[in-house]
Amino acid sequence: MNILVLNGPNLDRLGKRQPEIYGRTTLADVEKLLVKRADALGVTVIVKQSNYEGELIDWVHEAADAGWPVIINPGGLTHTSVSLRDALAEIHDGAGFVEVHISNIHAREEFRHHSFLSPIARGVIAGLGVMGYELALEYLVLNSHS
């Protein structure tokens, strides 16, 4: 089983950008953590990051065509991107996706409280730090329809 893990804008800056909110763990650290956990669960993760909405959408389309579930931390696109939601709707109808946020978006600025993606996600994990990625991975493996 393959699971696509997508990280949106600015997540390449993990460990450097606002460490008081996001911690000091880098995206490379997150990828190592996920690969190790995936190996233990007997699955494969493909971890990608882009600062460009269109590239994320292209990757979602590829996952939809392959029938892969997705873990996505959309970053700021959470609150703005109808296009990303429309792409993920196809995953929603298939293998499903889990929305992950390192920080608790509901405890932050008002504009961060709304997610265009949450209503169609299998689940949302927010505020548990990078552990949220691991929890999403475990959920998708345990609840796979394949």
Curated annotation (Swiss-Prot):
Signal peptide start-end: none
Keywords: Amino-acid biosynthesis, Aromatic amino acid biosynthesis, Lyase
Location of the active site: Y22 (proton acceptor), H101 (proton donor)
EC number: 4.2.1.10
Pfam families associated with the record: DHquinase_II
Enzyme class: lyase
Biological processes annotated in GO: amino acid biosynthetic process; aromatic amino acid family biosynthetic process; chorismate biosynthetic process; quinate catabolic process
Pathway it works in: Metabolic intermediate biosynthesis; chorismate biosynthesis; chorismate from D-erythrose 4-phosphate and phosphoenolpyruvate: step 3/7
Site location (Transition state stabilizer): R17
InterPro entries, A to Z: DHquinase_II (IPR001874), DHquinase_II_CS (IPR018509), DHquinase_II_sf (IPR036441)
Catalytic activity: 3-dehydroquinate = 3-dehydroshikimate + H2O
Similarity comment: Belongs to the type-II 3-dehydroquinase family.
Subunit-structure text: Homododecamer.
Function field: Catalyzes a trans-dehydration via an enolate intermediate.
Name of this chain's protein: 3-dehydroquinate dehydratase
Native organism: Corynebacterium pseudotuberculosis (strain C231)
